[in-house]
Structure formats: C-alpha cells, structure tokens
Amino acid sequence: MLELRRLKFAYRKGAEALTNASASIGGGVYLLLGENGAGKTTLLHLMAGLLYPGSGECLLNGDPIAARRPSDMQRIFFLGDNMPFPGRTIDEFVKMHAQFFPTFDPQLLADILGRFGINPAERLDGMSLGTRKKAQLAYALSLRTQVLLLDEPANGLDISSKKLLQEIIVENITEEQTIIVSTHTVWDFKNLFDGLLVLNHGQLLVASTVDEILVRIAFVSASEPPVGALYIERVAGRFNAIVKNDGDTDTAVSYTHLTL
C-alpha cells in the first residue's frame, strides 16, 4: 500500500509544487493526470524517494519512503521521460543495475524485448528514441517492483507499440503491484487503468479507483465553465470539466474529457 499523508513540497524561491496531498493507493494501474506544471513529476519523485517532502509523509507499507531504506528502495522503480541508462547495451545495464532488485525477472525481460523486436546486445546510443524507450520500459516492467512509477511512458512510441505496451502491462501486473502512469494522453491507456490521480496547481483533486470515481465525480462538456468544477480545460471552444457528482446514479468515465 502506498500512502500520502498531507504531503507538501516547494522548490527553493518558488510556490508550493504540492499542497496537502493525501491518498491511499492500492494495487492496480493508476493514471496521474494534470497540465504541465501541475506537480505530476514532483509527486512521482516524492513517491520514488528522489525528493524529500517539506512536510507530511509518503509511506510504502507503513514506512516513510524519504528514509530511503534499502528494503523499500528495492520495491520502487521510477522511469523518467528520456531518462538516460548507463551502459552500452541493455545486457550491460542489467548486469550493473538489476542486482539491486531481488524481484527482477530475466525471462520476462527477454520476453518483452522479443515482443518489441529488440536485441538486448544492441547499443543503446544507436537506438531511435522510440526503441530506446521500449527497451527501458521492458527493463522497468521486468523488475516486478511493488511500485512502478512511469513518467510519460508512451512518449516516442508509435500506435502499435502503445497498444502492445498496454497488453504487456495487463498480462504481467500482479495484484500486489501498483503502477502509476503520468500521462497527457489518456487515449494511450484508456482500457487499462484501475484508478485516477488528478493534480491541478499542486492540489490532488481526485485520488480514487474507477468504482469510486463513478459515484463521486462526473465528466461534463459545456459552453460555459461549470461552477465549482474540480478541473476545467477549454478544448475547441467548449469547457471539458470534472465536477462533483451530486446525483444518485453512477456516471460513465469519459475518456475524451480526460484527455488533459
């Protein structure tokens, strides 16, 4: 279980990047949504133990992640957008890095690389952006960490590779795993997610499973911005918004309105 308890963070000489974020995140795939500057990457860095909160806590199985205990760091992996991998090849990188993750599954890595059509002996610096991203995703998924944090994983992938990535995640995620995917393009993962995290100006507005979302919030499109909306984006002259659901019935999840 991943828990956020009144988590706050501010960069030097700047406004708060994250304000009083609280949530309990269980197993499954969660999409992390928000505009540029909303605080998505900051939140992922805090979850990964790469930043220290100004106040509050981020806990994994009850332990503060900021303490960076080796036993906790073995359970978390963060893959940033365009994050460099040291080593000339995937094989070489695995020899240097995978030893720190006891759950690493070399057969799964080989299987995913094969499905992506990647030779593990190929030089990383000779790969295209999309191929290098697929190699990195294959490695990240093969670690089988309890928490996997992916920042814009679909960037640089073509349509067929995005579809294959979805299939690979669905086939290999376990009930104990939590995968959090930061994305601007919900369509890339529209059939995949079990829950949503929505950030706006550093505020965590929504942190719920899909079942909870259908009861608590609604997705609307209107010619005027809805009063009291949790999130609003103007698209093609209309206002797509997430609002509180004040009715007695569940609403459908609108993937179009979620494309932030």
Describe each PLM feature range.
Residues 33-35:
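The feature captures the beta-strand-to-loop junction immediately N-terminal to the Walker
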Residues 148-152:
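Catalytic Walker B motif of ABC-type/P-loop ATPase nucleotide-binding domains
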Residues 164-180, 184-243:
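ABC transporter nucleotide-binding domain
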Residues 56-67, 71-72:
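Conserved ABC transporter NBD signature motif
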Residues 1-20, 25-26, 31:
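A short, flexible loop at the N-terminus of ABC-type nucleotide-binding domains that lies
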Residues 256-260:
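Conserved small/polar residues in nucleotide/adenosyl-binding loops
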Residues 48:
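Helix-to-loop junction immediately C-terminal to a conserved catalytic motif
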Residues 78-135:
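ABC-family P-loop ATPase nucleotide-binding domains
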